[in-house]
């Protein structure tokens, strides 16, 4: 592997790491109320000083999945945590995560395979 290939590989890993760190901070900011909405992937790319295509291609090459996949999974992880460890209603959690409650339930069920209410009930057992 030549030096240019090594540098490209190193840069790809750096972009991927920066993306995941940004997602963690951004999702935390939304949950805490410091930010009132989730950014789109093109907006995240802009914040990372990348084109949308470069970010998408890099994440897909490094991980095998589209950046949206990880964005959604990280939101689902936060939702699961809130459902398991808080007394907030499903509607409150949905609104905290900037979702309409009915859309949130569909989104959650798509990834988890059960409704937020059922997940909460089973996680308390």
Report residues per predicted region.
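Basic, amphipathic alpha-helix used for nucleic-acid engagement in HTH/winged-helix/SANT-Myb modules
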Residues: 1-12, 56
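Terminal helix-turn-helix DNA-binding modules in bacterial transcription factors
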Residues: 62-99, 122-125
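A short, Lys/Arg-enriched amphipathic alpha-helix from helix-turn-helix/homeodomain DNA-binding modules
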Residues: 10-48, 69-87
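Basic/polar phosphate-binding segments, predominantly the helix-turn-helix DNA-binding elements
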Residues: 42-70, 94-118
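Short C-terminal domain-edge/linker segments immediately following a structured domain
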Residues: 2, 49-53, 78
């Amino acid at each position: 592997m030549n030096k240019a290939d090594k540098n490209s590989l190193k840069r790809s890993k750096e972009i991927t790491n920066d993306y995941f760190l940004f997602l963690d901070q951004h999702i935390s900011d939304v949950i805490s109320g410091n930010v009132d909405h989730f950014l789109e992937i093109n907006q995240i790319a802009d914040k990372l000083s990348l084109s949308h295509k470069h970010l998408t291609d890099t994440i897909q090459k490094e991980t095998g999945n589209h950046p949206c996949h990880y964005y959604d999974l990280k939101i689902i992880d936060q939702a699961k945590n809130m459902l398991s460890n808080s007394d907030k209603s499903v509607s409150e959690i949905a609104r905290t995560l900037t979702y309409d409650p009915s859309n949130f339930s569909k989104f959650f069920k798509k990834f988890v395979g059960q409704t937020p209410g059922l997940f909460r009930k089973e996680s308390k057992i």
